[in-house]
Amino acid sequence: MSWLEAMILGLIQGLTEYLPVSSSGHLAIGSALFGIQGEENLAFTIVVHVATVCSTLVILWKEIDWIFKGLFKFQMNDETRYVINIVISMIPIGIVGVFFKDYVEAIFGSGLMIVGCMLLLTAALLSFSYYYKPRQKDKISMKDAFIIGLAQACAVLPGLSRSGSTIATGLLLGDNKAKLAQFSFLMVIPPILGEALLDSVKMMKGEDVVGDIPALSLIVGFLAAFVAGCLACKWMINIVKKGKLIYFAIYCAIAGLAVIITQL
């Protein structure tokens, strides 16, 4: 992997991790175009995912600081309830990661047709959430957190956008737009770090090898994903507040159809 390929893929990851267009799907498409092999993908994926977590920490640091200050008061306050909701949202993805990891990895290796189909599903979900207008609630309940977590678990499929699925689900439940966007980006931090840790352990045990990726390519990929992630995170929060997700539904529909046509 050259540094230029790493920069392009890093930009793709940073932008699509937050925008509702599926980072896994776009990374799969980009990797296929560049002819990047699976062992290279694993190492690079770990690096760019950690980069997007760092961008979330930077952009949402004020909210994270608020959570920890309230949490260490050791009482049942809004901050503690927020953390409980995040933990509840992690349950479905945790179950998928523990019991269905091999099945999910097999799907990732099944080609781009599944990516195209899931992009169309993302488009349908975003469209439905745009036109359906439930009564808005002020707070995200524990029940809502679990349902949003189910959406996140389904979004392990390549091409099905995680942010698109979780935000659209929350909108259909009537959750506050601004709070929902922040919750969607914060709830993914533990699963991403957990997956990165497991993949790192897997590589160190020798079950997978790091491909011949130069250190420069990894650094460039990290920086590209971090910068793009910071910009996309701020942009996406404003997009959700303004209710402009329909434009991404159109994009996902076009991209999904294009991928499917190329695979026929």
UniProtKB/Swiss-Prot annotation:
Predominant location: membrane
Q: Which UniProt keywords apply?
A: Antibiotic resistance, Cell inner membrane, Cell membrane, Cell shape, Cell wall biogenesis/degradation, Hydrolase, Membrane, Peptidoglycan synthesis, Transmembrane, Transmembrane helix
Query: What does the entry give for GO biological process?
Result: cell wall organization; peptidoglycan biosynthetic process; peptidoglycan metabolic process; regulation of cell shape; response to antibiotic
Q: Where are the transmembrane segments?
A: 41-61, 82-102, 106-126, 140-160, 213-233, 244-264
Give the record's GO CC terms.
Answer: plasma membrane
- Identify a single GO molecular function assigned to this protein: undecaprenyl-diphosphatase activity
Q: What does the record give as the reaction this protein catalyses? A: di-trans,octa-cis-undecaprenyl diphosphate + H2O = di-trans,octa-cis-undecaprenyl phosphate + phosphate + H(+)
Q: InterPro entries in the record, alphabetically?
A: UppP
EC primary class: hydrolase
The UniProt record lists the EC number as: 3.6.1.27
Indicate how the chain sits in the lipid bilayer.
Multi-pass membrane protein
Where is the protein localized? Answer: Cell inner membrane
- Asked if the keyword Membrane belongs to this entry, the reply reads yes
State any further remark: Bacitracin is thought to be involved in the inhibition of peptidoglycan synthesis by sequestering undecaprenyl diphosphate, thereby reducing the pool of lipid carrier available.
Task: Give the family from UniProt.
Answer: Belongs to the UppP family.
Question: What role does it play?
Answer: Catalyzes the dephosphorylation of undecaprenyl diphosphate (UPP). Confers resistance to bacitracin.
Q: What is this protein called?
A: Undecaprenyl-diphosphatase
Q: Look up and give the organism this protein is from.
A: Bacteroides thetaiotaomicron (strain ATCC 29148 / DSM 2079 / JCM 5827 / CCUG 10774 / NCTC 10582 / VPI-5482 / E50)
Report the gene name: uppP
